Amino acid sequence: ACAVMGLGGQAVAQAVSDEDELALAYGDKSFVSIATGSRVPVSRAPAVATVITAQDIASMGATDLDEVLETVPGLHVARETQGFAPVYVIRGINLGFNPQVLMLINGIPMTTVYTGNRGGGWGGMPVENIARVEVIRGPGSALYGADAFSGVINVITKTSSDIQGTEVGLRGGSFKTGDAWILHGGKWGAVDVSGYLRIGQTDGDRRTVQADAQTGSDAQRGTLASRAPGPINNGRDSTDGALDLSLDNWRFRVAYKERDDIGTGTGVASALDPGGEIYSQTITSDLTYENRNIAEDWAANMQVSVMHYTELTDLTLFPAGTRAFYPSEVYADGIIGNPAKWERHGRVGGSATYTGFKLHRIRLGLGAEREEVYKTRETKNFRADFSRIGTGSRADIIDVSDTAPFMRPQGRTKRYLYAQDEWNLVKDWTLTAGLRNDHYSDFGSTTNPRLALVWEAAYNVTTKLLYGTAFRAPSMSELYAINNPVITGNPNLRPEKIQTLEAAVSWQPLPKLQLGMNFFHYEMKDIIRLISSVYQNNGQQKGNGLEFEATWDPMKDVRLTGNYSYQRSVDEATGQAAANAPRHHVYLRTNWRFTPGWSVDPQVNWVSKRPREQGDPRSDLKGYATVDLTLRTDRASRGWDVAMSVRNLFDVDAREPTPYDVGQPFISLPYDFPLPGRSVYVQASYQF
């Protein structure tokens, strides 16, 4: 008996040791907070959720958040026409400027109210200060309100306990890329302190665009103004900083993000603009009080946050010599427009959780927000009908901010309240029910419910049945844009709406093998689209699909991860497949720690063909498969972490789709967006 007990104890100790070692290598992915507002096991969360840790990010060689998100099942990172900004396509929903995805940093929305997305000056997000990324696919408005439509992304930054000391790092590589950063985590008396500063610069990939909108105009007008064939303008200068202070139940955070000389990609009007640039500045701060035992059976959380966003531009919409709009008018220096906008956001909210009722966990919350574009400015050398001022030179640029603004300053207030109950119906069964009401001062109220039934069918099997609705608030430009012949706002817009039904199962058939699969069906209505140059609620879209993911540790030093996604979305008006989203998506990665302190990570990303919009004469855009490779040494005992990554190892000609302009006699970018070719990066960091 003693021998049996000894062997059993040894086996348990070995299992615990293996689990601890895996957690150290890959990070703790067993819990998620984004699904309910409190920390719960991922397998029992009332949502389809993915957690990516800092260890995952380092192993895959990612340098920007977009590279991290591309690995999430059901999520593909496409590109938009203006500034090559990322478009997070979740479950086939790829509309407008991508306002259907809510981006949070430490729970604070990064939404800019003018466009409803992350802003034209987003300029990427570096990963050095990211502790983990939590993603839910599906509606989240019952907890998070507006824009938690197709999904929610929450980026959680590092605290003093994550850093524990000082780290300095350097990176260099292709496209004249250079980055330097410093992280520090420690104590200042009784206060936990963490700080982060990063400076970066890149010229970006400069793959050639063979033809652009000016090429089509040249063919129509008999001019030779186009700069195509020519390179994409994808450079930027970056500055990021953050400070995190916590004491007992209080936490104060402030973050600064500046992007300068952001390239305009293929041009904001789909005409190459090699000298065009965008500047943005984002300043956020928040003060949070959290007490998990404020009274018997009660926990409370209160938060005040502010965000200030500035976006300035210097743009040549069409190049010198163009006759893009009037055959008799040649623009000496091109069609120049420089819109600028300033936003501020203020939020206050709180929640309370009560556990005094047996088998129930009740969460109540309320809050208010003020969001406004408080200042706009524009200088340009053309009138509202696109006729030129003077000869169309830079000397003819005038300030039209007071006489013909693209939008006058606007603001709105919203109030919200919500309730959620996590009810343990019987052993192994949990029902989560929630309801949230949001009232906006401009378009009124909307109420969104959620229901989630989770059954732990066996010690290694969990099933979920989920239902929820969500809404996407109209942006300020969609409501109030003026003095633009191709875009006019509509103050009578209603929010976009979606309802989603999901079924999910997670299964761990072996101690080192985890499998997950989910099926979904969604229905969208009141889609906001441009109809005859005016924004209107027009259109419906339905979709269904599945997502499969697996993690397998065949040996102690090897981990295989992968996922497959399928979606079929249909535009109800046309009966055709919804445009510009891949039907199939596969991601595979191997992490092999082949000797102590060293690892190699190859990964493959396959994106299937993407259907075109109705009326687009081009064939569907072909798919692509890229391979990345990262070699990394983490000599923790000596403080060094060195990595080399090769992205797009085989230099595949990968492309993302460009839009089709209905009624235009030519396609602005007929050969789509070329993605970066092969690139190599080397980085080294030292911790002490």
Annotate each predicted stretch with a short phrase.
Residues 185, 191, 239-241, 246, ...:
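Conserved C-terminal beta-signal and adjacent last beta-strands/turns
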Residues 109-137:
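Short acidic/polar hinge/loop motifs at secondary-structure boundaries
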Residues 34, 49, 66, 70-109, ...:
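Extracytoplasmic beta-strand/coil segments of soluble accessory domains associated
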